[in-house]
């Protein structure tokens, strides 16, 4: 559960309505793989991840980034029940994929950077604070199965 004020919730939803999920998702996942290269080990089947340009141009990275951000988008519709919304993904990432749950926090922070890059002045400190709450809540929900 994420506790947002009505103003924070409005800010998150207003900005999210402008997000190109495919573009932002691909960039966010790509940046995660470049900035934190140890996360690449979960994406062996994605082909060439040998350089930042290879990662950022990789169609499988872009496609999976879109998939990740689509799930995040669904979570925005259920801020009062993030654990329930992400229960199956938490189980998958814990039991089958064995992803370090810290990676969820890292991806959330990278997403905030990408949103700031894309929205510039519209991504005010207040909007950032609201998004930090949301990505922290999503990361906690995705890590729930690990506890």
Swiss-Prot record:
Red blood cells. GO terms for molecular function: haptoglobin binding; heme binding; hemoglobin alpha binding; metal ion binding; organic acid binding; oxygen binding; oxygen carrier activity; peroxidase activity. Residues 3-147 form the Globin domain. GO terms for cellular component: blood microparticle; haptoglobin-hemoglobin complex; hemoglobin complex. Heme b binds at residues 64, 93. GO terms for biological process: hydrogen peroxide catabolic process. It holds the Pfam family Globin. Keywords: Heme, Iron, Metal-binding, Oxygen transport, Phosphoprotein, Transport. InterPro entries: Globin, Globin-like_sf, Globin/Proto, Hemoglobin_b, Hemoglobin_oxygen_transport. Disulfide bonds: none annotated. The modification Phosphoserine is found at residue 51. Heterotetramer of two delta chains and two alpha chains. Belongs to the globin family. This is Hemoglobin subunit delta. It comes from Otolemur crassicaudatus.
